[in-house]
């Protein structure tokens, strides 16, 4: 799992 990808997804949801 990529941390940056997870952060990007969270930013999109937020």
From Swiss-Prot:
It is found in: Secreted; Target cell membrane. Keywords: Amidation, Antibiotic, Antimicrobial, G-protein coupled receptor impairing toxin, Immunity, Innate immunity, Mast cell degranulation, Membrane, Secreted, Target cell membrane, Target membrane, Toxin. The modification Leucine amide is found at residue 14. The keyword Zinc-finger does not apply. One of its GO terms (molecular function) is toxin activity. It comes from the Eukaryota. Expressed by the venom gland. Potent antimicrobial peptide and potent mast cell degranulating peptide. Is active on both Gram-negative bacteria (E.coli MIC=7.8 ug/ml, and P.aeruginosa MIC=62.5 ug/ml) and Gram-positive bacteria (S.aureus MIC=15.6 ug/ml, and B.cereus MIC=7.8 ug/ml). Its mast cell degranulation activity may be related to the activation of G-protein coupled receptors in mast cells as well as interaction with other proteins located in cell endosomal membranes in the mast cells. Shows a reduced level of hemolytic activity on rat erythrocytes. Belongs to the MCD family. Mastoparan subfamily. This is Protonectarina mastoparan.
